[in-house]
Amino acid sequence: SAEVAGAIIDGASLTFDVLQTVLKALGDVSRKIAVGIDNEPGMTWTAMNTYFRSGTSDVILPHTVPHSKALLYDGQKNRGPVTTGVVGVIAYAMSDGNTLAVLFSIPFDYNLYSNWWNVKVYKGHRRADQAMYEELYYDFSPFRGDNGWHTKSIGYGLKGRGFMNSSGKAILQIHVNKV
């Protein structure tokens, strides 16, 4: 099955069932996420990097995402008895010369924190790092993982439509398209 983290699938095939399959493959981890990002605006995306504020992934970020395809990725808290969640930013260079950035945040302690996500286009090519994480988390109106769909302009004539649940076993589905 192509429904594994690190795979590229047809954008039209990006469903919650696919993301649940990716999530199950991570096994019994208390904080984990399956990410699916659909490339609909007619560009090619090339992987730059993932910055993890906490947590990790055993999967290599899919390198090239053609138009009408979706990437699958995952993340999990660090192994062992550590009190961390999985928080990070994915960066893709887009063929228009800009960078697509996607934030995901699955906390360890739900008494203090909630799930959050964000998507934004940065001018030029920029790798994900701590500064990008802080901008996406604190400054650019992230969405709470509230089991609902949200849409916003993400810059440079593009919009992002996404969904994240509120669970520690999270799914994040984002569709990037022209405005």
From Swiss-Prot:
Residue ranges of the region described as N-terminal region = 11-30
- Localisation: Secreted; Nematocyst; Target cell membrane
Q: Which UniProt keywords apply?
A: Cytolysis, Ion transport, Lipid-binding, Membrane, Nematocyst, Secreted, Target cell membrane, Target membrane, Toxin, Transmembrane, Transport
ATP-binding listed as a keyword: no
Which positions in this protein are listed as binding an N-(acyl)-sphingosylphosphocholine 3?
Answer: W116, Y137
Temperature sensitivity of activity: Stable up to about 62 degrees Celsius.
> Motif Cell attachment site, crucial for protein stability: where?
144-146
- Per UniProt, where does an N-(acyl)-sphingosylphosphocholine 4 bind? Y133, Y138
* GO CC, one annotated term: other organism cell membrane
GO MF, one example? toxin activity
Q: Which Pfam families match?
A: Anemone_cytotox
- What does the entry give for GO biological process? cytolysis in another organism; monoatomic cation transport; pore complex assembly
What does the domain comment read? Composed of a long N-terminal alpha-helix and a core region rich in beta-sheet structures. Before the pore formation, the alpha-helix binds the lipid membrane, partitions into the lipid-water interface and stabilizes the monomeric molecule on the membrane. Finally, it traverses the bilayer, thus forming the transmembrane pore.
Q: Which family does it belong to?
A: Belongs to the actinoporin family. Sea anemone subfamily.
How would you summarize the oligomeric state and partners of this protein?
Octamer or nonamer in membranes. Monomer in the soluble state.
What task does this protein carry out? Pore-forming toxin (PFT) that consists of a crown-shaped octamer or nonamer that forms cation-selective hydrophilic pores of about 1.5 nm (inside) and 13 nm (outside) and causes cytolysis. It causes cardiac stimulation. Also causes hemolysis (HC(50)=0.3 nM). Interestingly, the Phe-16 is crucial for hemolysis.
What is this protein's name? DELTA-actitoxin-Afr1c
